[in-house]
Regions:
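Histidine-centered active-site/metal-ligand motif
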Residues: 7-8, 44, 55, 79
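Short glycine-/small-residue motifs
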Residues: 54-57, 120-123
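A short, acidic/glycine-rich surface segment
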Residues: 33, 42, 62-68
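Core segments of cupin and vicinal oxygen chelate
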Residues: 12-54
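Residue-level structural signal for beta-strand termini and adjacent loop
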Residues: 37, 60, 124-126
Length: 129
């Protein structure tokens, strides 16, 4: 086997447009594709994360789980970590504050937020600096 890198991560969400808006407008990920089901309804939105990988947001009909806290101990995907430049950290933090998006955790390398459905998102410059 020869894994060549990260291809994509898919997250199931109920409010597809709202969640896609967070990743597009707040985090600046460019939208690259939209897919519709046989019924014509929007099924998924793909966003470019750079390096050839993408984030696929997939519509589901169930509501998101309540906020379990930063570390909930459940199996499964813990978070989506996106790389930022260390030099951009203060600007990104100010933009999150301006938009009213609270940090749920912070380390010297990473800021953690939640998307509109509660998925953990890490904005990290580790090991840069």
């Amino acid at each position: 086997m020869n894994v060549q890198g990260f291809h994509h991560l898919a997250i199931q969400v109920k409010a597809l447009e709202d969640v896609a808006g967070f990743y597009r407008e707040v985090l600046g990920l460019p939208e690259i594709e939209r897919h519709h089901g046989d019924d014509g309804r929007l099924r998924s939105i793909w966003l470019d994360v750079g390096g050839g990988g993408f984030l696929a947001l997939e519509r589901v009909e169930v509501a998101p789980s309540p906020d379990p806290g930063f570390r909930d101990g459940r199996p499964g995907i813990f978070l989506v970590a996106l790389r930022i430049a260390r030099a951009d950290r203060a600007r990104i933090r100010a933009e999150l504050d301006r938009r009213g998006i609270p940090l749920v955790h912070e380390t010297r390398w990473t800021m953690y937020v939640r998307d509109p459905e509660g998925n953990r998102v890490a904005l990290s410059h580790h090991p840069d600096g």
